[in-house]
Amino acid sequence: MHRLMGVNSTAAAAAGQPNVSCTCNCKRSLFQSMEITELEFVQIIIIVVVMMVMVVVITCLLSHYKLSARSFISRHSQGRRREDALSSEGCLWPSESTVSGNGIPEPQVYAPPRPTDRLAVPPFAQRERFHRFQPTYPYLQHEIDLPPTISLSDGEEPPPYQGPCTLQLRDPEQQLELNRESVRAPPNRTIFDSDLMDSARLGGPCPPSSNSGISATCYGSGGRMEGPPPTYSEVIGHYPGSSFQHQQSSGPPSLLEGTRLHHTHIAPLESAAIWSKEKDKQKGHPL
C-alpha cells in the first residue's frame, strides 16, 4: 500500500511539474511580448516625427525658393518696363535711311510704342541710362561737357618758338624785355687765336673777371662791336629758315670788316710761325 501510495505520489508529482513550468513560461513570454510591442511603438513614433520634420523642411525650402523666383521675375519685368519707357520717351534711334525724290537720303526714326503700365523713373536715372547706351559721336557731341583745349605758353619762349597762343600773360614791354634777355650770350668767354695774338702783343692776357659775361665780339679794341649782343629775334627774324642763313651770310658790316682785318693781320704771323717750325724739324731730324 505504501509503495502504491508512493508511486501514486511520485506520479502525481511528475504529473504536476509540467503545469507549474508551463505557467512560468507563459508569464515570461507575456513580459517579452509586451517589451517588444513597446519598442515597436517607440520606433514608429520616432519615424513619424522624423517624417513630419522632413515635410516641414521641404515645404519651407520650396516656399523660400518660390519667393526668390517671384522676386527675380518681378525685377526682370520691371527692368524691361523701365527700358521700354525710356526708349519710348527719348531714345529715337535712326534706322535705315530712305532716299527721297530729290535723291537726298532721309533717316527714318523708329519710336517704339509706349507701354500702358509705365513706371515712374526719376529724370537723372533716365539721363544716365540714355548717356550710357547712346553713342557720343555724332549724336550727342553738343552735350559732352568737356573743357576747351587751350595751349598756353609760359611766356619765356622767344618769338619764333611761340606757339599758337594768343593769350597775353604779361605786358608787351615786359615780354620784349624777357625775349631780349633770354638770348644773351653765356657768361663764359669764347677764345680765338686772334685774341691770343692781341693779348701777347699788348702784354699778357687780361684777367677773366674783366671779361665775364661779355662775348668775344663785344670788345672795343681792333674795330670790334661794343654794347650788348643782338637779340635772337633780330638775328633769326620771324622765319627761322632761309632768312637766318641770309643774315648769317650778310651779317653786320662792322663784324665782317673786323674779321677781315683780323685775318689780314694774322696771315703773315702764321706764315712766319709755320716757317720756323719747319726749320726746327729739319735741324732736329737730319736727312
Curated annotation (Swiss-Prot):
The keyword Glycoprotein does not apply. A motif (PPxY motif 1) lies at residues 158-161. It is found in: Early endosome membrane; Golgi apparatus membrane. InterPro entries: TMEPAI/LRAD4 (IPR043445). Signal peptide: none annotated. The chain crosses the membrane at residues 41-63. Highest expression in prostate. Also expressed in ovary. A motif (PPxY motif 2) lies at residues 229-232. A motif (SMAD interaction motif (SIM)) lies at residues 186-189. Changing Y161A: Impairs interaction with NEDD4. Impairs polyubiquitination of AR. PANTHER family: LOW DENSITY LIPOPROTEIN RECEPTOR CLASS A DOMAIN-CONTAINING 4A, PROTEIN TMEPAI. Interacts with NEDD4 (via PPxY motifs). Interacts with AR. Interacts with LDLRAD4. Interacts (via the SMAD interaction motif) with SMAD2 and SMAD3. This is Protein TMEPAI. It comes from Homo sapiens (Human).
